[in-house]
Regions:
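Short polar catalytic/cofactor-binding loops
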Residues: 9-13
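FMN-binding flavodoxin-like domain, especially the glycine-rich phosphate-binding loop
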Residues: 2-4, 14-17, 21-29, 34-41, ...
């Protein structure tokens, strides 16, 4: 059984709802899922998972501080140990959505392996957005090969 870690930060609850949908998709694909807010996630969480989903809201065309905090704290303790670990990203926004680029850039610095296109959600995740988030979770679980 694959272990999928979902690390996110949320201000209004939209990104939390998106994280929950990603978790539903990963669980439906047979993965064991751990969801943590960026402020409480630890570098060991990243080392112990088989795949990771990174989610945030748009903060002035950048990822939110909670996710950035986790990535800052995790970089050096995990350096060279997470290369090619499958990852996917999701992002909620009110109109721009350009902050997803910051997540993908930092994931590249970790040398994580992108296994699905990012899901961008304008506002509250509903309808097709929920389906896309669940699919993202399933793809992430499948990418581990376990």
């Amino acid at each position: 059984m694959s272990k999928v870690l979902i690390v996110y930060c949320s201000m209004s609850g939209n990104t939390k709802a998106a994280a929950d949908a990603v978790a539903e998709g990963a669980k439906a694909a047979g993965a064991q899922v751990t969801i943590k807010e960026g402020s409480v996630a630890q570098p060991d969480d990243l080392l112990e998972c088989d795949a990771v989903a990174l989610g945030s809201y748009d903060a002035f065309s950048y990822m939110g501080g909670g996710l950035k905090d986790f990535l800052d704290r995790a970089f050096y303790p995990t350096q060279g140990q997470v290369t090619d670990k499958p990852y996917a990203a999701f992002f909620t926004h009110g109109g721009g959505g350009k902050g997803i680029e910051s997540i993908e850039s930092v994931a590249g610095s970790f040398k994580l392996k992108k296994v699905a296109d990012a899901v961008l959600v304008k506002g509250k995740p509903e309808g097709q957005a929920l389906a896309d988030l669940r699919t993202l979770g399933a793809k992430l679980a499948a990418a581990t090969g376990k």
